[in-house]
Structures are given as structure tokens and as C-alpha cells.
Amino acid sequence: MAKKGKKYLDAASKVDRNEHYSVEDAISLAKETSVANFDATVEVAFRLVIDTRKNDQQIRGAVVLPHGTGKTQRVLVFAKGDKASEAEAAGADYVGESEYATKIQQGWFDFDVVVATPDMMGEVGKLGRVLGPKGLMPNPKTGTVTMDVKKAVEEIKAGKVEYRAEKAGIIHASIGKVSFSTEDLVENFNTLQDVIAKAKPASAKGTYFKSVAVTTTMGPGVKVDTSNFKL
């Protein structure tokens, strides 16, 4: 394991590893201990007590954060005709059909999110082995397979984030930048936490939020007190 630098260790020393902080205090401390020399991303990790091997306990979705993420998302839309025109008018960065499928197969990935109308999924489905491992495959659960491409593009541009529980039941997501106010980050956090709480599978019994931590790019993790989380 690589040794941590003095700057990181100094920052980490401000965090009590045995303490579980309120959401506001955790975010404030994460901002204070950011060690990056750029506007770092503020991230949250939710460890859930679920079994993702069971189909009814696979959690995936998307939510528009009230204050966005601070990141400009490049959107590629697979659509044709009027729907292509709608996507362009809504601000999509790239709109097309098979020509973009060919570019992707040739190694082009200058985009962050892919949206597709249902009739284009036959074309997009062929890219599954390429887009899937990168988490870029459109999915109805995240609103990226839809006829309402205008809404999809506008929400993504406004700060929509996707969330998905990994094998260990952990959801990683960005809730903004260090430059955001603590209040805005708290509102983003609460919005994400609320939608994950509402997604609790009926078959998941007992404790749901096993642990939660807030961190910044390259910064130390700060544990969050989950005792007041609503379910």
C-alpha cells in the first residue's frame, strides 16, 4: 500500500475515526479536509444490508439533485426524426443513429451519459459489451431509455445522478463540489438518501443503512450518523 502524504495525514488527523457525525458536520469536515489542489468532488458511500444476488434486492435508479453536481455532463442520444430534433433542442451534445454506434465500436467515448429511444435499443443493444462495463448502457430504470428525450436530456444537464448498488451492497455517488456551500451539499445528500431509503426492498429486513461515509477526491472519509435516517 502506498504511503499517504503529509498533507493527507494532517487532514485525516482532524477526523475522529470512531465518531459518527451528523450529515451537516460530516460534510463540513469533508470540505475542510479536502487535500486536492482543485475543486474536488464530494462523494458519498452508502453501505446497505441487501443481497444483490436476489433480483428483488437490486437497487438502481436516478435522481435530480436540487443543486446539481457541478459537473457538465456530455449527453449522447440515439434517436431519429422528431425525437432527434427534440434531443438537439434540449441541449444534447451528440444526436444520431448508427453512425455513433460505429464510432463507439472504434473506441470513441467523448460522452458521459447515453440516452436512447426504445426503437433504437436494437442498435444500442449491440454495444452492450462496450458500454456495459463502463456503466454507460441506457436503462429504463434510470430514465435513459425513453421516448421523452427532452425531459431526459434536461434532467441530466440539470444535475441528475444515477445510483446503483454494487455486489457488496454499496452505492457510490457524487453530491457536488467542495466549492458548494455546506447547506447545498446537505440538501443534495438528503435528496439522494431519501430516494435510496424509498427504494428499500420489501424483502430486506432489519437494518438497511449499515454505514455511510462522506469523502472528497483524495480526502479522508468521514462517517455519518445514520440513526436519524428516515425509512
UniProtKB/Swiss-Prot annotation:
GO terms for cellular component: large ribosomal subunit. One of its GO terms (molecular function) is rRNA binding. The keyword Nucleotide-binding does not apply. The keyword rRNA-binding applies. Keywords: Repressor, Ribonucleoprotein, Ribosomal protein, RNA-binding, rRNA-binding, Translation regulation, tRNA-binding. InterPro entries: Ribosom_uL1_bac-type (IPR005878), Ribosomal_uL1 (IPR002143), Ribosomal_uL1-like (IPR023674), Ribosomal_uL1/biogenesis (IPR028364), Ribosomal_uL1_3-a/b-sand (IPR016095), Ribosomal_uL1_CS (IPR023673). Gene3D superfamilies: 3.30.190.20, 3.40.50.790. GO terms for biological process: regulation of translation; translation. Part of the 50S ribosomal subunit. Binds directly to 23S rRNA. The L1 stalk is quite mobile in the ribosome, and is involved in E site tRNA release. Belongs to the universal ribosomal protein uL1 family. This is Large ribosomal subunit protein uL1. It comes from Staphylococcus carnosus (strain TM300). The gene is rplA.
